[in-house]
């Protein structure tokens, strides 16, 4: 059952300039080591960072919290065996998900030119399945 949805659109140029302005500290604050390793390994690293930032924002929206009370590292976006995005929730994001009955988050990412977009769907058992 769908328990929440979220979408976010991010400018690749904005992520690149913010990273350059902070000497890369922004990337450390926003992304886990696994996320940074994944993006650095790509030819289009900033498109990867922008898509993952959009994904984190979309996941927070799907959880129903916005960014409130969560840490950027509480949502980790990696790639599954087939290459598709996988969401891992930890810390306060995992607690919010458990409280709301969310057992997983489906995620779609895309980027074109200067834009990256993410769409997240929080899923869990229906009320009748939870009883």
Swiss-Prot record:
Catalytic activity: apo-[ACP] + CoA = holo-[ACP] + adenosine 3',5'-bisphosphate + H(+)
Organism of derivation: Desulforudis audaxviator (strain MP104C)
Family, per entry: Belongs to the P-Pant transferase superfamily. AcpS family.
Main function: Transfers the 4'-phosphopantetheine moiety from coenzyme A to a Ser of acyl-carrier-protein.
UniProt subcellular location: Cytoplasm
Annotated Mg(2+) binding sites: 8, 57
One Pfam family in the UniProt entry: ACPS
Protein name as it appears in the record: Holo-[acyl-carrier-protein] synthase
Keywords from the named record: Cytoplasm, Fatty acid biosynthesis, Fatty acid metabolism, Lipid biosynthesis, Lipid metabolism, Magnesium, Metal-binding, Transferase
Cofactor(s) listed: Mg(2+)
InterPro entries: 4-PPantetheinyl_Trfase_dom (IPR008278), 4-PPantetheinyl_Trfase_dom_sf (IPR037143), ACPS (IPR002582), Ppantetheine-prot_Trfase_dom (IPR004568)
Single GO cellular component term: cytoplasm
One GO biological process term: fatty acid biosynthetic process
GO MF terms, alphabetically ordered: holo-[acyl-carrier-protein] synthase activity; magnesium ion binding
Presence of the UniProt keyword Membrane in the record: no
Keyword Metal-binding listed: yes
Assigned EC number: 2.7.8.7
